[in-house]
Amino acid sequence: MLDNNFIYKINSILPADISVNGFNKVQGEANARFGAISREYIYKIHQNKNPFLNNRSLFYKGTINIRLINEACKVLVTSSDFQSFSKVKTEINNFKCVINYARFEKSNDNFNFVISSNRFLRGMVRCIVGTLLEVNEKKISLKEFNKIVENKDRKGAGPSVLASGLYLSKVEYPSSIYI
């Protein structure tokens, strides 16, 4: 039986960038990584220099055209093979993912890219964000973005952005795993 101080105790031994907010009892065979049915990531971008956001968000100087970027996001939701956004040297051979939603949002003076999928490839979100920023800068047209996804070739996609703005924000599991 876990006592009332369990969350406090576990958080006291976890690294500073990880925290437990709650817990649920699950079946013995439940697997936190492979049992999830969806995951949501947020990539944070700020445009005003702020030392408190350093190493927590991407500082981006250009103007962000949310409408244009969200047009490109529609391509992600209607696609299923994301080899173009995967690491090149990888041992996996299945690049299929089901994107539930992908969108850019304004949050106060900052921006968030929010994406949910049944699974993600290694480096996928950071590569997608880098490529979407190239669409924003008009280095890549919407038509070219669509071709990048269709061609399944990492060389066509934009650069990966830094990991410092990437956050796993939500994981969903089937109700059958809970006790």
Predicted regions, residues:
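Structured-RNA-binding interfaces characteristic of tRNA pseudouridine synthases
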Residues: 1-179
